[in-house]
């Protein structure tokens, strides 16, 4: 196989499938001419990944240097001359090119919507259960900047992909001269390798899923056994003799006859989200609650996070693929520390992630009409775009209602209560029986008006907050849809570009892989569309019922007050 030599250091970004290389390092080329100016290669340690093509030069092992004759004896018996070896030989030469500034301003995405080719290059090396996570506790890390303001104040992921403006070096001048797209998701997710039939896997498939045709509708095979998971009992815990503290949540699943309860931290949820995002490349993973530090142990914050986690768990349980995911089932059921660590390692070394996961999906044999596929995907994309805008407007109005009800409306009711109290005090001077009855009625009215103000405040949390949480969950899920659709479009285009250069047999096999990918995308479109309808029916129906109960409660109080003046 061809080899190349690194001319510059290149530092990989986490969770991208890139491979760090050092100047002078010799690498074996696996695949060249990858979109965006990349090479896939292997280093001497066996790690595989992508690195910029313009950072390396072709390398051929040179022949050993000829054996030189022994040096002539010195002609002088004086002390040896000081060595004239230049400082350059020690790595400090002034002529050594400075490494390029590639990626210096690269914007890191916590959970790319379409993840890396492989995680096997980054296995966990630590056997300690707690220390397998970073030393910084999840509850005490600095708040991540919220770069996705378009999704709302509680958004967690970045809607728009960042693209690096930096490229590789010019070998003559050591300056950047070529733009390299670090977010070539079609390549890095392994989808390109799948499309061209070069997915590299050595292990057997342990998790299989199926797309079926039901009355002409393409969909995931329905769930055979529905189950639920409850996120509850948030509890403050600590480690290192109290130096680090965090909130742990219990998860109780109905999957088995015996309800099993496990305890998980937010950091564990975050790890699971990363595994799901990496493996299920064409499935938008719902968002977790945002990580926050300020007031992290306040009751309202803990309760809010618990509700978002519950929504997240609900969506996973309802998904025909995610609900049967091995890493998910391990997450909700494993109580043994040793088994947990082994399962964690298995997930991190899983070969069937990204594009390779498509090998785990069985689809109908019937070929798909490309035009019909394009039409369905485009319609879904338009639906997502219009729904996002509509939900943004709903989110803004609901936020406004919350502020008004918890602020001016509550205050005005309670100010009216104070006015009734003042009126009551003015009638206390009269000592007649009639005035005494009126005084009692006014005093009770003042108290009830104050209570109605509190009811308006509670309404914002109990009735409005769930709507906002559901809007957050939906928008955080579909924000990944544009990237998924883009990867599908690139796969289809790859086939169209290659079709004329392939034999009929090769073209047919490639078309089958494209069809399998299209079946998967349409099945997911069908699921997401059905979920949106059911979620919105349930959310708005529940909200309006609570609205009616709320106003009935206020009306009942006012009717009762009016009767006191009869």
From Swiss-Prot:
GO terms for cellular component: cytoplasm; cytoplasmic vesicle; early phagosome; phagocytic vesicle; phagocytic vesicle membrane; plasma membrane. Involved in the signaling of vulval development by acting as a negative regulator of epidermal growth factor receptor (EGFR) signaling. Aids in phagosomal membrane tubule formation which is required for phagosomal fusion with endosomes and lysosomes. Also recruits rab-7 to phagosomes by an interaction with dyn-1. These are events leading to phagosome maturation which is a step in apoptotic cell corpse clearance. Binds phosphatidylinositol-3,4,5-trisphosphate. Residues 1-61 form the SH3 domain. Residues 227-339 form the PX domain. Residues 155-173 have a biased composition (Basic and acidic residues). PROSITE patterns: PX, SH3. PANTHER family: SORTING NEXIN. Pfam families: BAR_3_WASP_bdg (PF10456), PX (PF00787), SH3_9 (PF14604). Changing residue 494 to E: Defective recruitment to the phagosome. It comes from Caenorhabditis elegans. Residues 127-140 have a biased composition (Acidic residues). GO terms for biological process: endocytosis; endosomal transport; execution phase of apoptosis; mitotic cell cycle; phagolysosome assembly involved in apoptotic cell clearance; phagosome maturation involved in apoptotic cell clearance; phagosome-lysosome fusion involved in apoptotic cell clearance; plasma membrane tubulation. Belongs to the sorting nexin family. InterPro entries: AH/BAR_dom_sf, PX_dom, PX_dom_sf, SH3-like_dom_sf, SH3_domain, Snx9_fam, Sorting_nexin_WASP-bd-dom. Homodimer. Isoform d interacts (via SH3 domain) with dyn-1. Residues 63-77 have a biased composition (Pro residues). Expressed in vulval precursor cells (VPCs) and apoptotic germ cells. Colocalizes with actin, dyn-1 and rab-5 in early phagosomes. The BAR and PX domains are required for recruitment to the phagosome. The SH3 domain is involved in phagosome maturation. Residues 362-566 form the BAR domain. The gene is lst-4. SUPFAM superfamilies: PX domain, SH3-domain. It is found in: Cytoplasm; Cytoplasmic vesicle, Phagosome membrane. Keywords: Cytoplasm, Cytoplasmic vesicle, Lipid-binding, Membrane, SH3 domain. GO terms for molecular function: GTPase binding; phosphatase binding; phosphatidylinositol binding; phosphatidylinositol-3,4,5-trisphosphate binding; phosphatidylinositol-4,5-bisphosphate binding. Residues 143-154 have a biased composition (Polar residues). Changing residue 265 to Q: Defect recruitment by phosphoinositide to phagosomal surface. This is Sorting nexin lst-4. Signal peptide: none annotated.
């Amino acid at each position: 196989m061809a080899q190349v030599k690194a001319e510059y250091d290149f530092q990989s970004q986490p969770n991208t499938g890139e491979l760090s290389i050092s100047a002078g390092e010799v690498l074996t080329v696996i695949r060249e001419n990858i979109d965006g100016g990349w090479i896939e290669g292997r280093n001497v340690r066996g790690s595989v990944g992508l690195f910029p093509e313009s950072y390396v030069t072709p390398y051929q092992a040179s022949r050993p240097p000829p054996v030189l004759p022994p040096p002539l004896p010195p002609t002088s018996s004086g002390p040896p001359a000081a060595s004239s070896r230049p400082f350059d030989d020690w790595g400090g030469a002034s002529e050594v090119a400075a490494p390029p500034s590639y990626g210096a301003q690269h914007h890191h995405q916590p959970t790319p919507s379409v993840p890396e080719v492989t995680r096997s290059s980054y296995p966990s090396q630590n056997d300690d259960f707690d220390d397998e996570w970073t030393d910084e506790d999840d509850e005490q890390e600095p708040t991540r900047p919220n770069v996705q303001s378009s999704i709302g104040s509680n958004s967690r992921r970045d809607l728009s992909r960042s693209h690096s403006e930096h490229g590789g070096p010019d070998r003559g001048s050591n300056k950047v001269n070529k733009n390299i797209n670090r977010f070539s998701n079609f390549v890095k997710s392994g989808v390109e390798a799948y499309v061209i039939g070069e997915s590299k896997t050595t292990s057997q498939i342990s998790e299989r899923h199926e797309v079926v045709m039901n009355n002409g509708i393409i969909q995931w095979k329905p769930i055979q056994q529905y189950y639920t998971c409850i996120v509850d009992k948030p509890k403050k815990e600590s480690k290192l003799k109290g130096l680090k503290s965090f909130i742990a949540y219990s998860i109780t699943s109905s999957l088995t006859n015996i309800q099993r309860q496990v305890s998980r931290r937010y950091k564990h949820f975050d790890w699971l989200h990363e595994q799901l995002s990496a493996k299920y490349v064409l499935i938008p993973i719902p968002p977790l609650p945002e990580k926050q530090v300020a007031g992290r142990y306040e009751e309202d914050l803990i309760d809010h996070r618990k509700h978002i986690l519950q929504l997240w768990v609900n969506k996973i349980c309802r998904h025909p693929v995610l609900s049967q995911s091995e890493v998910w089932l391990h997450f909700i059921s494993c109580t043994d520390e040793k088994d947990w660590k082994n399962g964690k390692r298995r997930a991190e070394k899983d070969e069937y992630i990204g594009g390779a996961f498509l090998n785990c999906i069985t689809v109908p044999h019937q070929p798909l009409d490309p035009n019909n596929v394009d039409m369905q995907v485009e319609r879904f994309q338009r639906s997502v775009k219009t729904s996002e805008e509509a939900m943004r407007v709903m989110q803004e109005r609901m936020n406004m209602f919350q502020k008004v009800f918890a602020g001016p409306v509550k205050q005005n009711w309670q100010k009216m209560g104070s006015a009734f109290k003042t009126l009551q005090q003015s009638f206390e001077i009269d000592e007649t029986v009639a005035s005494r009855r009126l005084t009692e009625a006014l005093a009770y009215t003042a108290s009830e008006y104050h209570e109605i103000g509190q009811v308006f405040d509670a309404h914002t949390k109990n009735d409005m907050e769930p709507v906002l949480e559901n809007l957050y969950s939906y928008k955080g899920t579909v924000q990944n849809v544009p990237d998924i659709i883009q990867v599908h479009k690139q796969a289809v285009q790859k086939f169209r570009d290659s079709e004329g250069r392939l034999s009929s047999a090769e073209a047919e096999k490639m078309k089958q892989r494209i069809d399998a990918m299209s079946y998967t995308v349409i099945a997911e479109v069908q699921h997401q569309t059905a979920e949106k309808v059911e979620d919105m029916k349930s959310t708005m129906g529940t909200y309006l019922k609570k609205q009616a109960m709320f106003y009935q409660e206020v009306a009942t109080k006012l009717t009762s007050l009016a009767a006191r003046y009869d």
